[in-house]
Amino acid sequence: MFERILLAVDGSEHSRKAVPVAGDLSRRYGGEVIVLHVREHEVTWGADIDVETADEARELVDGVVRELKDSGANVRGEVMRVALGQTPRAILDLARDEGVGLIVMGTRGLSDWGRLLMGSVAHKIVHLAEVPVLVVR
């Protein structure tokens, strides 16, 4: 059913909850999980400032990949570096380029505010994705 599943992670508690869900779907349907973490950077006054280091990002992805492999999932990891605010576009572009059938991601808990039901990245992905999106909270 899902030959490729894109698991977008950011290291938060909310995204951690999506990891076992993606692993279960991979094992159940025999699909590959692509673990993606997007590193943002900002250019300010001529300086290029990373929100996190490349090593921190790689460590995050490698940890999730190990966890999913240990649970029997077929998995690989990707780290992308984009300009601040471009994370949704990077996720959607990779999903398209890889022929992903499902995007899995976490979000913060629900609130009473209509547009704030999901984190802004999850909100944009849900509304712009061309494939199903499973949001785990």
Residue ranges and their predicted role:
Residues 3-51, 69-77:
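Small/aliphatic-rich secondary-structure junction motif
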Residues 30, 99-101, 130:
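Residue-level detector of structured alpha->beta connecting loops
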Residues 36-63, 86, 90:
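Acidic, proline/glycine-rich short linear motifs
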Residues 37-38, 106-108, 137:
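Short secondary-structure boundary segments
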Residues 50-54, 94-96, 121-122:
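Short, hinge-like loop/turn segments at secondary-structure boundaries
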Residues 69-103:
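Structural beta-alpha unit
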Residues 102-127:
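Glycine-rich, Arg-bearing micro-motifs that act as flexible, cationic patches
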Residues 128-137:
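Short, acidic/small-residue loops that bind anionic groups at enzyme active sites
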